[in-house]
Amino acid sequence: MLRRVAVAAVCVTGRKLRCEAGRELTALGRIEARGLCEESSKPFPTLTMPGRNKAKSTCSCPDLQPNGQDLGESGRLARLGADESEEEGRSFSNVGDPEIIKSPSDPKQYRYIKLQNGLQALLISDLSNVEGKTGNATDEEEEEEEEEEEEDDDDDDDDDDDDEDSGAEIQDDDEEGFDDEEEFDDDDDDEHDDDDLENEENELEELEERVEARKKTTEKQSAAALCVGVGSFADPDDLPGLAHFLEHMVFMGSLKYPDENGFDAFLKKHGGSDNASTDCERTVFQFDVQRKYFKEALDRWAQFFIHPLMIRDAIDREVEAVDSEYQLARPSDANRKEMLFGSLARPGHPMGKFFWGNAETLKHEPKKNNIDTHARLREFWMRYYSAHYMTLVVQSKETLDTLEKWVTEIFSQIPNNGLPKPNFSHLTDPFDTPAFNKLYRVVPIRKIHALTITWALPPQQQHYRVKPLHYISWLVGHEGKGSILSYLRKKCWALALFGGNGETGFEQNSTYSVFSISITLTDEGYEHFYEVAHTVFQYLKMLQKLGPEKRVFEEIQKIEDNEFHYQEQTDPVEYVENMCENMQLYPRQDFLTGDQLLFEYKPEVIAEALNQLVPQKANLVLLSGANEGRCDLKEKWFGTQYSIEDIENSWTELWKSNFDLNPDLHLPAENKYIATDFTLKAFDCPETEYPAKIVNTAQGCLWYKKDNKFKIPKAYIRFHLISPLIQKSAANVVLFDIFVNILTHNLAEPAYEADVAQLEYKLVAGEHGLIIRVKGFNHKLPLLFQLIIDYLTEFSSTPAVFTMITEQLKKTYFNILIKPETLAKDVRLLILEYSRWSMIDKYQALMDGLSLDSLLNFVKDFKSQLFVEGLVQGNVTSTESMDFLKYVVDKLNFAPLEREMPVQFQVVELPSGHHLCKVRALNKGDANSEVTVYYQSGTRSLREYTLMELLVMHMEEPCFDFLRTKQTLGYHVYPTCRNTSGILGFSVTVGTQATKYNSETVDKKIEEFLSSFEEKIENLTEDAFNTQVTALIKLKECEDTHLGEEVDRNWNEVVTQQYLFDRLAHEIEALKSFSKSDLVSWFKAHRGPGSKMLSVHVVGYGKYELEEDGAPFGEDSNSREGMQLTYLPPSPVLAESTTPITDIRAFTATLSLFPYHKIVK
């Protein structure tokens, strides 16, 4: 798969960038941390590097001087105190700058301005779907409405606290099925095979999307993002991580708004979220909020750049947050590999710096060396946070004139120091060293075999109109016939390949651009890694001999043009973040297109880049646990074990010669899946507001809704093939995983052309059935859907493929289990959900051994008896939709189920009291612990679910302030609204480190917080209560950004068989009926003497977690193969107040079960 970034989507645990073929890839080097308060559009997890909790610190792109952004011919200089009548005179048309090229499908208007202090801004007016308004609304009308709305706004933020990473993680437990993209995606390009090889994504992963739909699709927020054209490259040598630390510190109060967490509290109160990221050469801040409060939010946010306080006391506490972030990042192979790669740069190059920062570099070492970190922070801010380095993007349902007035008034106060921006472009060829063209063996944390081949090229940003690396990566990452991966898969040497440049700062900056090819190897592939590398070099040599092909370029260009022309709108906060970075890179006319379109075919530019990809300039990194014992070096910051070897002489000599090409490697054929018909279809049945059931038989049913809102030539097809066979045993669950992964493997080559033509598909091994998801341009979508069903019908596997997939699945299960947060979830759901097979059960069943015959028998039985449920939405007729279901039924020719099957687990009813399940983490090199305190409620109504959402929303800010800001217990701290197979509850989770705290201490502090929170809500004013209710209503009231959000919400109702498509309306109605006493009574009832409380501790390894003999965990530890739960007893103090769970099966065997329950009324 090629690695090219389209529009980035962000998420809680990290950042994933969606690649051209519609799958996901993790961006190497992106330092990130996401707040859980607003779980962005799509859970695209990422690597994490330094960043505030809600911060994503990123090592991002080049920092080139933008072209054409000064005043120029049609440039516009915003003036302080501009004449109001002149401004109003322009407002009636609300027409944007014609120079800025936008998609015909984009209803927004754009205007570029430059303030007198040098700050450049892009104003985005989104007046589409404004009820009762048109694009001709005047500033006066807007301001009048604003004043009226603000009359009842209560500005008491005093009690609301900092929430950099907290936020209500309102996610349904059933949605938490494994391989939900937030929790179980691999954090490494080398490991992306797990995306397809995990079965962890159950059908309730779809429910996770419902949560996100609830939070982000219900309102199109106003949003802003600001990019400072300076990042971690500017870190002083004696204070590593200072740029990242400053990005944290500017949030901590300002001269105008001194409350330390005032901005976060203001956003939280008004349904907003914020984040920030530190990159190599850029630092980005962004937020969104309800439109009504956008102007005030802009003023509060701008103070970060006008006069932040950065008081000494806050510095000491925030260093702990940065250090916790670093500790969380240490077990990531992606981060470890990146740090190792940076260390290969020549001395003096900034890539060799430690961007993260930690307590050692920001506190202890400075103290030892008499460095005043506080003074240096302010000095760094004054030097580098200058207006003329900044690009700002604001988007709201205001006229362009209104936005210009606000931006000019507020952001003109940012100082301009008049100093030139730091420039690193003279530091070229950082990796032109003898150490680069070597073989590096690395011992990873995870179970993985991977080979990464990397070249460091001259900076490529100036070639954005040609995008030579995108052209090359499209071919190298191709998975169809004649491709590298197709050949390696046939040899059973590789499972996945990602090639190209992810456009992060680590991969592309003003000093170099990386081109890398990461290949996930099988066990056999690891043994033949030199042959694998040779295959890559043969393919590249073939491309070099052929030279650039205009046919291929034009095919890529056509695919990109189609996607741009018919693009769907994205979440505003993601969009403005992307645009403010684009403003640093592209001239004004290409702000919206520069990162996506291929403008010019220049074969000489492509050839110049292609001809540098030769073996003599390549760096080889081989990751494998098999390297243990032969790696005698250790990277300073992440402790990565590695060795450096000369490439074997026989291969060196071969690659120097005119070696033969491989006849099995060739260019891809012409793509038959590229859409050419974009006609919008007419209705062939009555229009409905919600999906209607148009087919209902014993074998299946179909829900359908024709799109008449977004009016794009795309469709979404989703099917759930339900079978009772899957959950009958742990072995069956594993066989189902193997089946889905082999099916995905079988489809990889024939379906790849569809994938790159913007037709996306995913097969998900759900808890109760196979989920098929297909979307894209409707013209050729039936071809892809039929291809999937054909391969499902004719499923087969060779012994070699079966062995390859089962071996990889062992690694996948292992990699999931060694993460404390995912093990904690597995333990919690194993306790709560009756008859659930845990990940450890599955791992053990796989280790016990399964045969190909058992798989084929399982698949035969699975296909013989099913119930199929589907949803089709978009630019398709009802007749065409029925054809999809008919095709499934006719091809599979299955019998109906003998009885209706529930698509959820029964849940155990916890006894009253406090129950504690404390287990050791399974990665003995990981200091991270996870503590979750869960309160079970029971079978509740939709009204009570909504009340619980409101409770958690109230809880977010004080939870974060108490547990992270004041107690500094950990980086990730959040309350969560839990829906576990229809049974309600709420929890508070803290990720901490055993090097700093004992898990029981954290548990007690969580209880301390909940006690203080009870007092807080009792003293809540009616105004403060109503403000929060209004904020949640607003989040549920606004329109979807694009069709996919509406589909996600509807699919969640279908896949859980709840069918309450107007759920949001019912929740809004419930919210309007709540009083403060409802909230207080509900909380007290669940915290009282009869409360049902479960604490789950996954205990890391460090000095605060000692075994009974006083030895730290992990010393003289057993082999990593021992994947058993090791229960730990509570301390004598905690034992007095808790009931320990030391055998989950024995504990749950004695408990009653709740009846199956759905939250539908």
From Swiss-Prot:
- Positions carrying Phosphoserine: S85, S91, S93
Matching entries from SUPFAM superfamilies are given as: LuxS/MPP-like metallohydrolase (SSF63411)
- Report the gene knockout effect: Knockout mice are born at the expected Mendelian rate, but high lethality is observed within 48 hours from birth. Surviving mice are smaller than wild-type animals, have several neurological defects, impaired motor activity, and deficits of working memory. The cerebral cortex is thin and lateral ventricles are enlarged. The volume and proportion of myelinated axons is markedly reduced in both central and peripheral nervous system.
Keyword tags: Cell projection, Hydrolase, Metal-binding, Metalloprotease, Mitochondrion, Phosphoprotein, Protease, Signal, Zinc
Q: Which residues bind Zn(2+)?
A: H244, H248, E325
Lipid metabolism listed as a keyword: no
List the coiled-coil residues: none
Composition bias of kind Acidic residues appears in 138-209
An example Gene Ontology CC term for this record = dendrite
Any single GO molecular-function term of the entry would be: metal ion binding
> Where is this chain primarily localised?
mitochondrion
Top EC class, one word: hydrolase
Please name the catalytic residues of this protein: E247 (proton acceptor)
The cofactors required by this protein are: Zn(2+)
Biological process per Gene Ontology, one example term = positive regulation of axonogenesis
Q: What subcellular locations does the record give?
A: Mitochondrion; Cell projection, Dendrite
Q: Supply the Pfam families for this chain.
A: Peptidase_M16, Peptidase_M16_C, Peptidase_M16_M
Indicate yes or no for the key word Mitochondrion. Answer: yes
UniProt-annotated stretches for the region Disordered: 49-103, 130-218
Spell out the subunit comment.
Interacts with BACE1 and NRG1.
Q: What does this protein do?
A: Cleaves peptide substrates on the N-terminus of arginine residues in dibasic pairs. Is a critical activator of BACE1- and ADAM17-mediated pro-neuregulin ectodomain shedding, involved in the positive regulation of axonal maturation and myelination. Required for proper functioning of 2-oxoglutarate dehydrogenase (OGDH).
Q: Which family does it belong to?
A: Belongs to the peptidase M16 family.
Q: What is this protein called?
A: Nardilysin
Which species? Mus musculus (Mouse)
Q: Name the encoding gene, please.
A: Nrdc
